[in-house]
Amino acid sequence: MATQDSQGIKLFGKTITFNANITQTIKKEEQQQQQQPELQATTAVRSPSSDLTAEKRPDKIIPCPRCKSMETKFCYFNNYNVNQPRHFCKGCQRYWTAGGALRNVPVGAGRRKSKPPGRVGGFAELLGAATGAVDQVELDALLVEEWRAATASHGGFRHDFPVKRLRCYTDGQSC
């Protein structure tokens, strides 16, 4: 696509000309790039893990800016930026970035909550019969009295479920 002439670079049908200053700066940059690999090779011998230290999590424990607790832990780098390490306080359960503002996360957020224990027992456990404090005779007597009151008010028959009237249509009239 790009071809270089003595006048400049031809790119997409348009010729871009060089000034004398631009060509000199390009030559200087090329010379600096040739010198930099030599410098990088010497620094690599001195500290082979210099690149790894930038990605490594911080070792220093930072106190929480809200509750001043030292029970904090490093979580991750915010937006994958090594200049913004994100921390979590176990005391007040808040996230914050070092040197940044404290996030307003409600207490209890940021941790997995345990599931509530399932109900093992049935009706007797709800009434407190698991302790043995409720007499079965009193419970039976209350149920019998309630049954008798309900049957008396409904003409001798207790309706536990609402009855839906069936409709059958023959010639437009209901049965």
Swiss-Prot record:
Main location per the UniProt record: nucleus
Biased composition (Polar residues): 37-52
Pfam families xrefs: Zn_ribbon_Dof (PF02701)
InterPro entries: Dof (IPR045174), Znf_Dof (IPR003851)
Presence of the UniProt keyword Repeat in the record: no
Keywords: DNA-binding, Metal-binding, Nucleus, Transcription, Transcription regulation, Zinc, Zinc-finger
Induction: By red or far-red light. Circadian-regulation. The transcript level rises progressively from dawn and decreases during the night.
GO molecular function, one term: zinc ion binding
Name of the molecule in the record: Dof zinc finger protein DOF1.5
Disulfide-bonded cysteines: none
PANTHER family referenced in this protein's UniProt entry, alphabetically: CYCLIC DOF FACTOR 2 (PTHR31089), DOF ZINC FINGER PROTEIN DOF1.5 (PTHR31089:SF59)
Region (Disordered): 29-57
Annotated Gene Ontology cellular component terms: nucleus
Domain of life (superkingdom): Eukaryota
Positions occupied by motif Nuclear localization signal: 162-168
Gene: DOF1.5
Residues in Dof-type zinc fingers: 62-116
Source organism of the structure: Arabidopsis thaliana (Mouse-ear cress)
Any one Gene Ontology BP term: regulation of DNA-templated transcription
Job of this protein: Transcription factor that binds specifically to a 5'-AA[AG]G-3' consensus core sequence. Acts as a negative regulator in the phytochrome-mediated light responses. Controls phyB-mediated end-of-day response and the phyA-mediated anthocyanin accumulation. Not involved in direct flowering time regulation.
UniProt keyword Transcription present: yes
Localization terms from the record: Nucleus
Protein residues bound to Zn(2+): C64, C67, C89, C92
